[in-house]
Amino acid sequence: MVYISTDYVFDGQGETPWEPDCKDYAPLNVYGQSKLGGELAVAQTLEKYFIVRIAWVFGLNGKNFIKTMLKVAKNHPQVRVVNDQIGTPTYTYDLARLLVDMMETEKYGYYHVTNGNLPFRTN
């Protein structure tokens, strides 16, 4: 089974990236709590699973932060965004390819999946 989760299972207050098997959960909202509940249910029920935590997803279709910022930049002389968030964007095409590759293995467990190694700050 593949369960798509989120970085929202953590509180975002760490100084270093969380390891995939980290159990220091601290969801800050209902979305994070519900995804954590799903993760725990999968891990307690199944032996063979991929729990894949993703963040800042963007792609060609649908709404996302990058498209929104491009639209704002076209229509406004100045763009303002929060500057207290750090994350690593995840491109949908790359995520889909990785998920297909993962399912062809038996390397079950928890995974943090984003593009690149360095976090992206919104300022």
Where in the sequence are the language-model features?
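NAD(P)-dependent short-chain dehydrogenase/reductase
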Residues: 40-87, 93-94, 100-101
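Catalytic helix-loop patch of NAD(P)-dependent Rossmann-fold dehydrogenases
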Residues: 9-52, 57
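Short glycine-/acidic-enriched loop or helix-start segments at secondary-structure transitions
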Residues: 12-14, 61-62, 91, 122-123
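Tryptophan-centric aromatic hotspots in well-structured domains and transmembrane helices
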Residues: 18, 56, 65, 108-111, ...
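Hydrophobic structural elements of the Rossmann-like NAD(P)H-binding subdomain
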Residues: 2-4, 52
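Mid/C-terminal beta-alpha module of Rossmann-like enzyme folds, strongest
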Residues: 98, 105-123
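Histidine-centered beta-alpha loop that forms part of the nucleotide-sugar donor binding/catalytic region
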Residues: 5-7, 84
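Residue-level signal for the nucleotide or nucleotide-sugar donor/cofactor binding architecture
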Residues: 29, 87-90, 120
